[in-house]
Amino acid sequence: QALLPNMRQQNYGRIINIGSVHSVVASPFKSAYVAAKHGLLGFAKTLALETGDCDVTVNTLCPAYVKTPLVENQIAAQAIENGISEQEVIDKIMLAPMPKKAFIGIDELAATAAFLLSNDARNITAQALVIDGGWTAR
């Protein structure tokens, strides 16, 4: 919100939030995380409504699992907790709900963000762009 006055004055701005697939769906045992991600999406949609009178767009990228250090730690922790191998965590827990069975690449997120920053996306606002390998199709 600190940037909005400047964006309004210039009549231009692009805001991209990084949410999660959990911005649009829930999962058991993740209530605080899901609530935070839903809140981020609500904030983005509200901000998009508030900036609809100028060339400012507000969108949220909602990826499924991206292989980051945080996810690597989750894999190791879940392997110990469930008494299974890390590969089994990846195959049977993390990628199981995704028809594509692959982690989302940083390059995929960057390409989507680059498009949203372009003038070709000037009428795309208040959107949750879900990049989830088909997870939410179920």
Features from the language model and the residues they span:
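A short, exposed helix-loop element centered on a Lys and neighboring polar residues
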Residues: 1, 45
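C-terminal substrate-recognition "lid" of short-chain dehydrogenase/reductases
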Residues: 4, 12, 100-131, 136
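Residue(s) in the substrate-gating loop at a strand-loop-helix junction
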Residues: 20
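Active-site loop immediately N-terminal to the catalytic Tyr-X3-Lys motif
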Residues: 25-31, 53-54, 101, 119
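Active-site helix of classical SDR
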Residues: 36, 44
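Short, flexible catalytic-loop segment of classical short-chain dehydrogenase/reductase
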Residues: 41, 63-73, 77, 81
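Short, small/polar-rich loop/turn modules that mediate ligand/substrate recognition or access, typified
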Residues: 52, 57, 124-126
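Catalytic Tyr-x(3-8)-Lys segment
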Residues: 80-106
